[in-house]
């Protein structure tokens, strides 16, 4: 059974036993590994997506300093915004004015309406929106803090981890994985093989 629940509720659902897995754009982060395990399926980083006419204003990370930036609560963009703000402060620049929204569509809407100047999220989500919206927002600058994306599963659930790992290996071996990523302009985010993450030490 597939059930749609808010992003911020998915890890709690796994931890409480209400869900068997959560498949979305979860960046594998140390704080998340304390609650769940992951099977990686892509490599990504946080990127800024802006209106096409603003693309040249955001060519490097510190260009985000002092700007109104929209993020989804609990997302990699949310975490990245805090890290970039710390770098801004260290460089004696104004910190990011972070706007937190419950869903990506709300962050996107904030930029399109002019309430925010950029949307900070993982490169897959931002790249997908750029392609499917025909460039209403465009990805600009570099990818920040590259990390694996993973399917989240309950902590210690080795059987589900093995099942997901085997599925991904099969999709990679038969070419389906590459075909899907290329179709959405995400080929650069491909992995050679999935990895089961159970401990923070694996991220070092």
Predicted regions and their residues:
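A ligand-binding cleft/hinge motif common to bilobed small-molecule-binding domains
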Residues: 9, 25-33, 80-84, 112-145
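Bilobed "Venus flytrap"/periplasmic-binding protein-like clamshell domains
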Residues: 26-27, 44-103, 118, 123-127
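Periplasmic-binding protein-like
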Residues: 43-50, 131-168, 187-204
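Ligand-binding clefts/hinges and TM-proximal coupling segments of bilobed small-molecule sensing domains
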Residues: 76-92, 169-204
């Amino acid at each position: 059974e597939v059930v749609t629940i808010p992003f911020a509720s998915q890890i709690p659902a796994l931890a409480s036993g209400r869900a068997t897995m959560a498949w979305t754009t979860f960046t594998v982060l140390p704080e998340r590994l304390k609650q769940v395990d992951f099977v990686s399926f892509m490599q990504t980083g946080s990127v800024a997506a802006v209106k096409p006419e603003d693309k040249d204003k955001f060519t490097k990370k510190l260009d985000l300093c002092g700007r109104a930036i929209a993020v989804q609560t609990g997302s990699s963009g949310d975490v990245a915004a805090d890290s970039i703000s710390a770098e801004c402060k260290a460089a004696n620049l104004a910190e990011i004015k972070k706007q937190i929204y419950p869903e990506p569509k709300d962050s996107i809407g904030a930029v399109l309406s002019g309430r925010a100047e950029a949307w900070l999220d993982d490169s897959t989500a931002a790249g997908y929106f750029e392609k499917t919206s025909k460039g209403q927002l465009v990805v600009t600058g570099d990818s920040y803090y590259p990390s694996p994306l993973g399917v989240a599963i309950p902590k210690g659930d080795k059987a589900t981890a093995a099942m997901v790992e085997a599925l991904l290996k099969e999709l990679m071996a038969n070419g389906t994985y590459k075909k899907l990523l290329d179709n959405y302009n995400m080929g650069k985010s491909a992995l050679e093989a999935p990895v089961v993450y159970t401990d923070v030490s694996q991220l070092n």
